[in-house]
């Protein structure tokens, strides 16, 4: 079997590449095509653990679900996790190989490209179709040399490209026409269709613009996709937090606040809280005060010591101290757990400069970062009401100390995780996705003060949203002009 590959590229970041790829994966799977997702290179702080014990971007895990297959490290062979303004942890085929500054990584790209092509070849041997997703824009002039994320990959595997742009941002015709104008002749030739995303209103009002675009570019517009209200899919990368924030909900609800430090990771952990009908969720940003809350969640971090210093500079440590003094609850996840201990040690400089620092000191434990990253999926039960829990661990920290004698989770394999404070105000765990299971989410909300929490089935909600995307594409995306680049469907 040798798969056909079709690639989704965007005229800008956040144009809708991930959503279009996800919907197309489900649409093809519905039609009996054995399909897999692929993203050559991803820069993301939201990641997922695969069945083969590696790490990929969160969007590729969701796209694998859309395909009805298990996520695999070959689906995102290069993952960059920013840990400073100029550097990232580099993950190749699911495994961290070290930290690199941007200039150093540029020289490493030929090696990364070999991994990209090897992963693609393995998937191509197993599937009928690969839906690949680009990163950012293919027309970034300063990134064209040695590109492995967009047209560099498309040229290497000789695949067609669909170019998508977001009309919600304005300037959609300039984005599409301008992107095509900046491509080389061979790159422009492999663009087989254009998509206008997130249009509100009557699409007939756009007809003159679409007609002009097709005449000007010589490319068919495959669809004008409507704005989907109440569509909830996990954000792909660190840019997800740059969207407008603030409180969600109100009235007689549990108040949950989450301080967002610069290197917050896996903030998809918050999604079930954002969507829960009985939760008023507030993402607290730089310069803002932590509002009155029943529960404060300290999320994961790609640089715990740096984010903890930043948290203190915001005065949030004092706000947390007051919150606990007046009976509030605090939940730490992964890096948040490490912050709650007495000491943090990074002797090898795995996340930043080598060194040690004081934690917040509310749990009697210390954490040392070690080169071997723990990547695993786990199932078990919370020590809160024996509620069933499931999720994944992604961390380099090894935590030790008396606080761990009161664990937060007991896993099915007999191991334990995390800590609960003796006064039961603090719950800390390495388990990402701890709110995803309905019973676990209910137990935590009850512990935080909500008397009768409703069950929110977040995995079922994700599945319904994938179907919602595919249903929309069935109605609004014309695949006929690109039929020859797709496998036969039933």
From Swiss-Prot:
The active site is at 334 (nucleophile), 432. InterPro entries: Class_I_gatase-like (IPR029062), CobQ/CobB/MinD/ParA_Nub-bd_dom (IPR002586), CobQ_GATase1 (IPR033949), CobQ_N (IPR047045), CobQ_synth (IPR004459), GATase_3 (IPR011698), P-loop_NTPase (IPR027417). Coiled coil: none annotated. Keywords: Cobalamin biosynthesis, Glutamine amidotransferase. It comes from the Bacteria. Pathway: Cofactor biosynthesis; adenosylcobalamin biosynthesis. The keyword Transferase does not apply. This is Cobyric acid synthase. HAMAP family: CobQ (MF_00028). Pfam families: CbiA, GATase_3. Disulfide bonds: none annotated.
């Amino acid at each position: 079997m040798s798969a056909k590959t079709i690639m989704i590229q965007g005229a800008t970041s956040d144009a809708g590449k991930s959503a279009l790829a996800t919907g197309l994966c489900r649409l093809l799977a519905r039609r009996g095509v054995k399909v897999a997702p692929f993203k050559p290179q991803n820069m993301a702080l939201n990641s997922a653990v695969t069945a083969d014990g590696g790490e990929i971007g969160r969007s590729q895990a969701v796209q694998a679900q859309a395909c009805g297959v298990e996520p695999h490290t070959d689906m995102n062979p290069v993952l960059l996790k920013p840990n400073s303004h100029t550097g990232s942890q580099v993950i190749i085929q699911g495994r961290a190989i070290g930290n690199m500054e941007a200039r150093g990584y540029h020289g490493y790209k030929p090696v990364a490209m070999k991994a990209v092509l090897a992963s693609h070849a393995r998937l191509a041997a197993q599937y009928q179709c690969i839906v690949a997703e680009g990163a950012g824009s293919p027309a970034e002039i300063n990134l064209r040399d040695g590109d492995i994320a967009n047209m560099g990959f498309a040229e290497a595997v000789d695949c067609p490209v669909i170019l998508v742009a977001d009309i919600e941002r304005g300037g959609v015709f300039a984005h599409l026409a301008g992107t095509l104008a900046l491509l080389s002749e061979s790159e422009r030739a492999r663009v087989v269709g254009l998509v206008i995303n997130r249009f509100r209103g009557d699409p007939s009002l756009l007809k003159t613009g679409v007609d002009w675009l097709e005449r000007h570019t010589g490319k068919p517009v495959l669809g004008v996709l409507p704005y989907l209200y109440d569509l909830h899919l996990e954000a792909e990368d660190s840019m997800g937090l740059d969207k407008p924030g603030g409180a969600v909900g109100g009235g007689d609800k549990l108040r949950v606040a989450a301080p967002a430090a610069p290197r917050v990771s896996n903030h998809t952990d918050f999604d079930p809280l954002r969507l829960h009908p009985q939760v008023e969720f507030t993402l607290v940003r730089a310069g803002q005060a932590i509002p009155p809350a029943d529960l404060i969640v300290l999320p994961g971090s790609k640089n715990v010591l740096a984010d903890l210093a930043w948290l203190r500079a915001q005065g949030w440590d004092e706000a947390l101290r007051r919150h606990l003094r007046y009976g509030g609850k605090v939940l730490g996840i992964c890096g948040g757990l490490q912050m709650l201990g007495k000491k943090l040690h990074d002797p090898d400089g795995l996340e930043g400069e080598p060194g040690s620092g004081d934690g917040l000191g509310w749990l009697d434990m210390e954490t040392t970062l070690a080169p071997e990253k723990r990547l695993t999926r786990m199932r078990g039960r919370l020590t809160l009401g024996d509620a069933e829990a499931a999720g994944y661990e992604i961390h380099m920290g090894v935590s030790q100390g008396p606080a761990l004698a009161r664990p937060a989770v007991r896993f099915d394999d007999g191991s334990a995780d995390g800590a609960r404070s003796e006064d039961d105000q603090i719950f800390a765990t390495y388990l990402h996705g701890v709110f995803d299971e309905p019973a676990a989410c209910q137990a935590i909300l009850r512990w935080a003060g909500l008397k009768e929490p409703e069950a929110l089935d977040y995995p079922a909600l994700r599945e319904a949203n994938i179907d919602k995307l595919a249903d929309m594409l069935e109605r609004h995306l014309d695949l006929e002009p690109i039929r020859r680049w797709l496998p036969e469907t039933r």
